[in-house]
């Protein structure tokens, strides 16, 4: 029996789940709105809320905790500057999950998870690979 066990396994291993939520959290902070399956969106919500709370707290320790979770310095900078400033007066409830019908291929229930009061211009930002920094340049 699985009484009192919180969270969904989503059919993947724990390391896969951790990496998936890291990638989804980075995408959510970068684009401020993403489309995914409904169970993944519902599981991503507390992860994103805790990261935004870290951004609001500020300070070096909170920044290191956020970097340990996200592993992307540009996204951590956006989290601690723009997003933290936007939600400084809001006590939680930074994200919303909207149902978005079903996926054509397998009829999976889809959802849009977005930041409340989001920046609409952030939606289509380039998500391609970043150019590698050349270590020989000085």
Curated annotation (Swiss-Prot):
Taxonomic superkingdom: Bacteria
Cited InterPro entries: Ribosomal_bL17, Ribosomal_bL17_CS, Ribosomal_bL17_sf
Record carries keyword Ribosomal protein: yes
Keyword Ribonucleoprotein belongs to the record: yes
Gene3D superfamilies: Ribosomal protein L17
GO terms for MF: structural constituent of ribosome
CC annotations in GO: cytosolic large ribosomal subunit
SUPFAM superfamilies reported in the protein's UniProt record: Prokaryotic ribosomal protein L17
Keyword terms: Ribonucleoprotein, Ribosomal protein
Classification via Pfam families: Ribosomal_L17
GO BP annotation list: translation
Subunit structure: Part of the 50S ribosomal subunit. Contacts protein L32.
Record family assignment: Belongs to the bacterial ribosomal protein bL17 family.
Full protein name: Large ribosomal subunit protein bL17
Record organism: Granulibacter bethesdensis (strain ATCC BAA-1260 / CGDNIH1)
Lineage of the species this protein comes from: Bacteria, Pseudomonadati, Pseudomonadota, Alphaproteobacteria, Acetobacterales
């Amino acid at each position: 029996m699985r009484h009192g066990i919180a969270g969904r396994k989503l059919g993947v291993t724990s390391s896969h789940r951790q990496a998936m939520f890291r990638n989804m959290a980075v995408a959510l902070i970068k684009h401020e709105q993403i489309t995914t399956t409904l169970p993944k969106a519902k599981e991503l919500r507390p992860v994103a809320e805790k990261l935004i709370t870290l951004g609001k707290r500020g300070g070096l320790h909170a920044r290191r905790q956020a970097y340990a979770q996200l592993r992307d310095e540009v996204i951590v900078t956006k989290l601690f500057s723009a997003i933290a400033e936007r939600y400084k007066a809001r006590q939680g409830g930074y994200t919303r999950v909207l149902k978005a019908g079903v996926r054509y291929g397998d009829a999976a229930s889809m959802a849009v998870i977005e930041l409340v009061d989001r920046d609409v211009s952030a939606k289509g930002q380039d998500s391609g690979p970043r150019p590698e920094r050349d270590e020989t340049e000085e």
